[in-house]
Amino acid sequence: MARALEQADGRWAWVVLLSSLVTQALTLGFPTCIGVFFTDLQRDFQASNSETSWFPSILGAMVHGGGPLCSILVKHFGCRVTMMLGGVLASLGMVVSTFSGSLTHLFLTAGVITGLGMCFSFQSSITVVGLYFVRRRPLANALASMGLSMGVTLWPLLARYLLETLGWRGAFLIFGGILLHCCVCGALLRPVATNEVPEPKEDPLLPPKIPTRSCLATCVSTIRYHLAFDILRHNMGFCIYVTGVTWMNLGFALPHIFLVPYAMHHGVDDYWAAMLMSIVGFCNIFLRPMAGLLLAGRKSLAAYRKYLFAVAILINGLTNLICTVSADFRVLLGYCLVYSLSMCGVGILVFQVLMDIVPMDRFPSALGLFTILCGVTSLISPPLAGLLLDKTNNFSYVFYMSSGFLVSGSLILGVGFYAAEKKKLKQDGQAKMENATSEMTPMHDLTSEDKDSAKKQPYPESIYMTNV
C-alpha cells in the first residue's frame, strides 16, 4: 500500500473522494434503515424485540468487526480490490437473504455476509481518503462523511417505499443490486504513484537473518502487527481513543435502531416515522461540509480536535434525553434537528482524530483494531436494549441507556486526553532539564589540569548550550 503520495491533493483525489462518499452512503447508511423493517421482521418470524434486535446487532458487528481482515487485504491487495470484493459480498448476502425461512438464515446472510462486505468497502473508502489527501485531509474527511448523511436521508425513505410495494424480501433483493455499485466505486481507485522505493517482498515480521520460525510464532506476530497491539501498548492517545469510543459505541447506534419503532409505537404514521431518520441525514448533508471547512481553514483548532470530539459526544448523549420527555412528532422533530448537530461533530471527527493520533502507514491496522472492538459493542448493545424493552415495555429506558453510555464515553475521552497531555508536557519539561544539566559540566568536577586547559580554549568554543 502506498504511504507517501507524489501528488497529494491532486485532481484525481477528488474523484476518489466522490467514490468514498458514495461508498459510505451505500454501506454506513444502510443499517439506519433496519428500523423500518423491524416490525415486519418481528411479525413474520414471530420473534420478540430482543430476538429481532440480533439482526441489526450482527450487521453492525460485522461492519466494524471485520476490520483486521480488511486491513490485511488492504495491505496485500490494496484498497481497490478490497472495496470491489466488499461490494460483491454485500450484494450476495442481501440477495440470498430473500430466501430466508428463519431469523437464523437472515442473521447469516444479511447479517454476516452483507456486514463483512460492507466492512471491506467502508474501511477501504476511509483509508484511501487518508492516502490521497494530506493538506486538505480534514476537509476531505468531512466531505466523505457526507456519504453517511446521504445514506441516512435516502435509505429509510427508499426502504419504506419498497416495503409497501414489494415487501421486505423484495426490498432486500433491490438492496442487493444497489450495494453492487460499491464495485464501481472501487474501480475508480486507480493505483497511486509514490516517491518511495518499493518495499521488499520479504515479510517484515520475518527478518532474513532468521532461517526458520514456528508457525505459531509467525501467526502471533502477524496478528500483533495487523491488530496494532504495539500501538495500543505504546501510544497512550490511541489507548484512550479506543477505550472512550468503544464505550461510547454501546449507546451511539441505539437511536438509529429504535427511533422509528418508538415513534410508530406511540401512534406516529409509518411514513413520518421513517422520515425522522431522513431528517437527521438531510441536515447533516449541509452541516458536515461547513464543519469540515471550519476545521480545515483554521489550523489553530488542530490541537483541540480531540476535545471537540469529546464535546460532540457529550452533546449527543444529552440530546437523547429529549425523547424521554414526549413521543409527540413535533418533539421528535426537534430532537432530530438537535441530534443532527451533535451527530455531525461525531461523524467528521471520529476518523480525523484517529489519523491525528497514529501515523498513516499504521492507520489501516489501528482502524482494524478499533473497529473490531466497536464490532463487539455493536453486537452486545441492540440485544441488550431489546431485552430491556421486553422487560419494561418502555422505550424511554432505551434512550436513557444510550445517553448514559455516550456521556460516560465523552468523559473518558476528555479527561483521558487532558491527563495524557499534562503528563507528556511534564515529561518533556523534565527531559529538557536533564539534557541541559548533562550538557553543562560543573567546574568542581574537573582537575586542576582540566581547568587550565579549559581557560586556554577560545571563548566561542567553550560554550555548547543548544536547544536541539
From Swiss-Prot:
Question: Where is this gene product found?
Answer: Cell membrane
* Keywords linked to the UniProt accession: Cell membrane, Membrane, Symport, Transmembrane, Transmembrane helix, Transport
Q: Which GO terms describe its molecular function?
A: symporter activity
On the tree of life, the source organism's domain of life is Eukaryota
> What membrane topology does this protein have?
Multi-pass membrane protein
Q: Which GO terms describe its cellular component?
A: plasma membrane
Q: Where is the composition biased (Basic and acidic residues)?
A: 446-455
Q: Which InterPro entries match?
A: MFS, MFS_dom, MFS_trans_sf, Proton-linked_MCT
Q: SUPFAM superfamilies given for it?
A: MFS general substrate transporter
What ranges does the record give for the region Disordered, renumbered to this chain? 429-468
What transmembrane ranges does the database entry give? Answer: 14-34, 54-74, 81-101, 103-122, 139-159, 172-192, 240-260, 275-295, 307-327, 331-351, 369-389, 397-417
Extracellular compartment: which residues? 35-53, 102, 160-171, 261-274, 328-330, 390-396
Give residue ranges on the Cytoplasmic side: 1-13, 75-80, 123-138, 193-239, 296-306, 352-368, 418-468
> Matching PANTHER family, A to Z?
MONOCARBOXYLATE TRANSPORTER, MONOCARBOXYLATE TRANSPORTER 6
Q: Member of which family?
A: Belongs to the major facilitator superfamily. Monocarboxylate porter (TC 2.A.1.13) family.
Name the job this protein performs.
Proton-linked monocarboxylate transporter. Catalyzes the rapid transport across the plasma membrane of many monocarboxylates such as lactate, pyruvate, branched-chain oxo acids derived from leucine, valine and isoleucine, and the ketone bodies acetoacetate, beta-hydroxybutyrate and acetate.
What is the recorded name of this protein? Monocarboxylate transporter 6
The protein's organism comes out as: Mus musculus
